[in-house]
Design a protein with these regions (language model features):
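N-terminal secretory signal peptides that target proteins for export/translocation
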Residues: 1-6
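Bacterial N-terminal signal peptides
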Residues: 11-22
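Sec/Tat signal peptide C-region and signal peptidase I cleavage site
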Residues: 25-29
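Short, surface-exposed "cap/lid" segments of acyl-processing enzymes
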Residues: 30-65
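Serine-dependent carboxylesterase/thioesterase catalytic core
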Residues: 33-39, 62-66, 71-160, 176
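Short, well-ordered alpha-helices that flank and scaffold nucleotide-derived cofactor binding pockets
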Residues: 53, 57, 109-110, 213
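Short, structured coil segments at secondary-structure junctions
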Residues: 59, 116, 184-187
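C-terminal catalytic-base region of ester-bond hydrolases, centering on the histidine
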Residues: 159-227
Length: 227
């Protein structure tokens, strides 16, 4: 876990010994769903500093970024479930980047998160795996392997259960996760943002704008194609 950084500079409130970063906003009464941000492989909550601050500038928006316990998506999904319960949220939107999109989808699909999640957004998520992860231990990122038992189970049955708005976004310059692997089968919004590399999803403004449309809903929530 990264050492403490300048909290004043980040403008965040730090809870639970850096396991959670909350980006405070003025007037958090009635308003949009809270947004939960899930980081990628070997990262932590601070990966969302830029997007978190952008969300914090929107009216009435509660935004929380978690630091996951490790790189096992099953354990991470359970941790997400427990943190949502601890936060007392009855509705939320969830955004995951890279491997974090798998941890988030495990929570949505396998742990009944679909009952309270309004929008699920995947940024460069390897939904159907990447070969480069096949060299990693299962609990250290190997679950992202195309042939992992985790992905086989996760992708069995309906990819997009419930009344959730599903968006999968891919950066046109992402050479880590192929576009074909980022898509979900049935009822998802597919978006490509040109010239975005795999490490830039959390900071790119066009990606942020697409995420906002997805979590806000409405008739124009999908800036891409729904299939």
């Amino acid at each position: 876990m990264r050492p403490a950084r300048s909290i004043r500079r980040l403008g965040v409130a730090v809870l639970s010994v850096f396991s959670l970063l909350a980006y405070p906003v003025a007037g958090q009464a009635a308003g949009p769903d809270p947004v939960l941000l899930i980081h990628g492989w070997r990262a932590d909550a601070s990966a969302w500093d830029v997007m978190g601050q952008r969300f914090a500038a929107l009216d009435g928006r509660t935004v929380v970024a978690l630091t996951l316990p490790g790189n096992d998506n099953v354990v991470n999904g359970q941790y997400i479930r427990d943190q949502v319960a601890a936060l007392g949220w009855s509705r939320l939107d969830i955004v995951g980047v890279s491997m974090g999109a798998l941890s988030a989808r495990y929570y949505v699909k396998s742990l009944n998160g679909a009952a309270i999640v309004d929008a699920y957004v995947s940024l460069g998520g390897p939904q159907y795996g990447i070969m480069s992860a096949c060299f990693l231990p299962q609990s250290q990122g190997g679950q992202m392997c195309t042939y992992s038992s985790f992905l086989k189970a996760l992708n069995t049955g309906d990819d997009t259960p419930g009344a959730v708005r599903y968006m999968t976004l891919w950066g046109g310059s992402d050479t880590t996760v192929p576009q074909s692997s980022t898509k979900l089968d049935g009822g998802a919004c597919y978006v490509t943002v040109p010239k975005v590399v795999h490490t830039a999803y959390e900071e790119d403004v066009a990606v942020f704008n697409a995420v906002v449309r997805a979590v806000d809903g409405g008739t124009t929530w999908c800036p891409g194609t729904i299939k």
